[in-house]
Swiss-Prot record:
Taxonomic path: Eukaryota, Metazoa, Chordata, Craniata, Vertebrata
Main location, first listed in the record: membrane
Known role: Is a positive regulator of nascent focal adhesion assembly, involved in the modulation of endothelial cell attachment to the extracellular matrix.
Single GO MF descriptor: extracellular matrix binding
Identification of the protein by name: Thrombospondin type-1 domain-containing protein 1
Organism: Mus musculus
């Protein structure tokens, strides 16, 4: 066995040596695969052995294309070159296919070449990779599109016969799988020749395929059937899709236009719907605002602006193809809607002329959200002719017709004249009023008393008259006087409750004679005088010599009425404030002269002061004032105030200012009540000594007494009375002042008054003796005859009952003449009584009217 293996090994070694050392011929390709049209060359390696004699023969390498069965080129080897590499350029490889490299040796005997197929090389050539794309053109409305051809392979630079490319496009209306069921498909081909480049866009026009269009693109070399690259079929609707042409934000004025941009080569046919912005929460449901259908080939549609809400809101538009039933386009936008519309027409204006051809005009306003820049479309005004009467053909000769402005001018003149006349009347009225108020010197001053009930507006009472001389201004018959000032609290205090500021405490001793020294002659108002005359006549008819009447007193003294006789509630002798006084009081027509100081007043004491020289009046109006001055310890020592009473009061002053609960007064013709006796201070003077006429009272005259010695008496006390004291100061009686001392007594000051009498005497003459007596507890009331003269003698005095000036002619001295019996009956002085035993009841004061 071993010898057999040894022999076989030797045989293999001989064969191997023969192969290695023997002759070998071959062709070798570096790259078996090549890219057509590329810029790379093909390299082929060869090895060829010479013959036995060592001579070289001619050898060539042939490039043969198998697809076309033709030789493309042949290259020869050098004679003395047994091995090497041959280069084949890129332009030999224009198409993809199979290529062969074959070595062909030369035969020596006859010179023919026989290819050695056993000694050949195979080359595979492929097409380069081209990318095809479709795109919209700038003229999308024209129905065109673009085909792009791109490759990343570097192409060969053909020196001659550079090949061209051919781009073929095939349009169809359906996909290949649907052709059998729907019949013969519609195909439209379009080709374009182009140069061989690495990338380019080739534009094609659209074929009228329909709503659906499919495109297939193929790339070939010109003149060849082989396809370099192809793509398709491509659904253009899916490739490009539908687009809605609209701005992101638009202001809707009248209508909103929306344009649908379809894919290239596709006709529009579908539904365009409008939805409000999608809700933010999923549970909310969107609602459709409107929907418009687009017919075949129509790309534009409009929506009315009234469909959208006022303001800025977001809406979405969806377009869908009818066949597919789904929306393939959606766009959202902000729509601003403003209110811009025309308002109603205004009425027609009047015709421009009164005759002939005329026109009229009417206007309307633009209602808009932006009044500063209204943009309503249309005319804001319009005109129309007016059909009026024909104008007169023949006109009378004369001046030119008046222009339409002349009536307006005449109307203006009338208006200006009327206004001027009205202004003149107003101006004249103002001047007359000012002249009446400031142009004349006032006959009498008009002092007022604050908080007056009968004159709340500080006016002169209706029943007051001026009794002063023409050359001397006097104070008005008001409720307040111009006398000396008292304390600030004295203003507004009733007349009968004002304390004397000039009387010292020791003057209480002279209270017994204060009855005669405090008489006052006054003139009654007209209504009171006539009322007295009427009462006297009634008494005469009834045969009465004495009677009592109670009158209801209103704020207007002219409306006093008679009521049944009644008892009056007691007076408040604690000096109440004016605000608590009764509104049914009657105010004095003369000036009140409050005292210079205040003091404390015991209850059931009445105060008064001596009056200054006043107007001379008739003795028929003389009233007897019974007064008594209380002692004062200091001006600010007590919280309760007593106020001095002025001597210049009217005859109705006996109706005291009382509380509001006393709306009635009692009036008597023969007797007086005991508690409300006002202190009159002017009776002490006689008519014989009053030769001078009345003079205006001076404020400075009554401020301080001229003769202080008259206020000093034997019974002077050193301590003042307390505010709640019930005791009375004991005074000594004074003598009755004679007529010579009367003037000094008037200026001296106030005298103290005695307390009220406990009973009434038959006459003032009988009471005068008892009044001069004094008591350790209180002074006895007494009366004294006031005057030595009879009323007839007083009437003869030159100072009449009424002023003789023509201004006072209304007071007729002869209108109130009485009979002799009435004269004798009424020739009694008034007197005041007092009843201190009954402190709870009292009647309103009454007065005696002496004619």
């Amino acid at each position: 066995m071993k010898p057999m293996l040894k022999d076989f090994s030797n045989l293999l070694l001989v064969v191997l040596c023969d192969y290695v050392l023997g002759e070998a011929e071959y062709l070798l390709l570096q790259e078996p695969v090549h890219v057509a049209l590329s810029d790379r060359t093909v390299s082929v390696g060869f090895h060829y052995l010479s013959d036995v004699n060592g001579t070289l023969r001619n050898v060539s390498v042939m490039l043969w294309e198998a697809n076309t069965n033709r030789t493309l080129t042949t290259k020869y080897l050098l004679t003395n070159q047994a091995q090497g590499t041959l280069q084949f350029e890129c332009f030999y490889f224009k198409e993809a296919g199979d290529y062969w490299f074959v070595m062909i040796p030369e035969v020596t005997d006859n010179g023919t070449q026989v290819p050695l197929w056993e000694k050949s090389a195979f080359l595979k050539v492929e097409w380069p990779v081209f990318h095809i794309d479709l795109n919209r053109t700038a003229k999308a409305a024209e129905g065109t599109f673009q085909v792009g051809v791109f490759t990343t392979q570097p192409l060969c630079l053909f020196p001659v016969d550079k090949p061209d490319m051919l781009v073929d496009v095939i349009f169809t209306d359906r996909l290949p799988e649907a052709r059998a069921s729907l019949g013969q498909p519609l195909e439209i081909r379009a080709s374009k020749r182009t140069k061989l480049t690495q990338g380019q866009w080739v534009e094609f026009g659209c074929a009228p395929v329909g709503v659906e269009a499919y495109v297939t693109v193929m790339l070939r070399l010109l003149g060849q059937d082989s396809v370099i690259a192809s793509t398709g079929p491509i659904d253009l609707a899916q490739k490009f899709g539908y687009k809605l042409m609209m701005a992101p934000e638009v202001t809707c004025e009248s209508v909103l236009e929306v344009m649908v941009l379809p894919p290239p080569c596709v006709f529009v046919q579908g539904v365009l719907a409008v939805y409000k912005e999608a809700p933010k929460r999923p549970e909310e449901r969107t609602f459709q605002v409107a929907e418009n259908r687009l017919p075949l080939g129509e790309r534009r549609t409009v929506f009315n602006c009234t469909l959208f809400d006022v303001g800025k809101n977001k809406y979405c538009f969806n377009f869908g193809i009818v066949k597919k039933g789904h929306f393939s386009a959606k766009e959202c936008m902000l729509i601003q809607r403003n209110i811009e519309t025309w308002g109603p027409w205004q009425p027609w204006s009047p015709c421009s002329t009164t005759c002939g051809d005329a026109v009229r005009e009417r206007r309307r306003l633009c209602v808009t959200s932006f009044p500063s820049r209204p943009s309503c479309s249309g005319m804001s005004s319009e005109t129309s002719p007016c059909s009026l009467e024909e104008c007169a053909v023949f006109r009378p000769p004369g001046p030119s017709p008046v222009s339409p402005q002349d009536p307006v001018k005449s109307n203006n003149v009338v208006t200006v004249t009327g206004i001027s006349l009205c202004l003149f009347i107003i101006f004249a009225t103002v001047l007359i009023t000012l002249w009446r108020r400031f142009g004349r010197a006032p006959k009498c001053s008009t002092p007022v008393r604050h908080n007056s009930i009968h004159s709340p507006g500080f006016r002169k009472n209706s029943d007051e008259e001026n009794i002063c001389e023409l050359s001397e201004p006097r104070g008005s018959f008001s409720d307040a006087g111009d006398g000396p000032r008292g304390s600030p609290g004295d203003t507004g205090i009733p007349l009968t409750y004002r304390c004397s500021a000039s009387a010292p405490p020791e003057d209480e001793a002279s209270g017994s004679e204060s009855f005669q020294s405090n008489a006052q002659k006054i003139i009654p108002p007209l209504f009171s005088y006539r009322l007295a005359q009427q009462q006297l006549k009634e008494m005469k008819k009834k045969g009465l010599t004495e009677t009592t009447k109670v009158y209801h007193v209103s704020q207007s003294p002219l409306t006093d009425t008679v009521v049944d006789a009644t008892a009056s509630p007691p007076l408040d002798l604690e000096c109440p404030e004016e605000a608590a006084a009764s509104k049914f009081r009657i105010k004095s027509p003369f000036l009140d002269q409050p005292g210079a100081g205040t003091g404390e007043r015991p209850p059931s004491r009445l105060d008064g002061i001596v009056p200054p020289p006043g107007c001379a009046v008739s003795p028929s109006q003389t009233l007897i004032q019974k007064s008594q001055i209380r002692s004062t310890g200091g001006r600010d020592g007590s919280s309760e105030r007593c106020h001095s009473r002025s001597s210049l009061f009217r005859r109705t002053a006996s109706f005291h200012e009382t509380k509001q609960s006393r709306p009635f007064r009692e009036r008597s013709l023969s007797a007086l009540t005991p508690r409300q006796v006002p202190a009159y201070s002017s009776r002490m003077r006689t008519w014989d000594q009053m030769e001078d006429r009345c003079r205006p009272p001076s404020r400075s005259t009554h401020l301080l007494p001229e003769r202080p010695e008259h206020f000093q008496g034997a019974g002077r006390t050193s301590s003042p009375l307390g505010p709640l004291s019930k005791s009375y100061t004991v005074g000594h009686p004074r003598r009755k002042p004679d007529p010579g001392d009367r003037q000094a007594g008037l200026v001296a000051g106030a005298e103290k008054m005695e307390p009220h009498r406990a009973h009434r005497g038959p006459s003032p003459s009988h009471r005068s003796a008892s009044r001069k007596q004094s008591s350790p507890i209180f002074l006895k009331d007494s009366y004294q005859k006031v005057s030595q003269l009879s009323p007839s003698h007083f009437r003869k005095d030159k100072c009449q009952s009424f002023p003789i000036h023509p201004e006072f002619a209304f007071y007729d001295n002869t209108s109130f003449r009485l009979t002799e019996a009435e004269q004798r009956m009424l020739d009694l002085p008034g007197y005041f009584g007092s009843n201190e035993e009954d402190e709870t009841t009292s009647t309103l004061s009454v007065e005696k009217l002496v004619i």
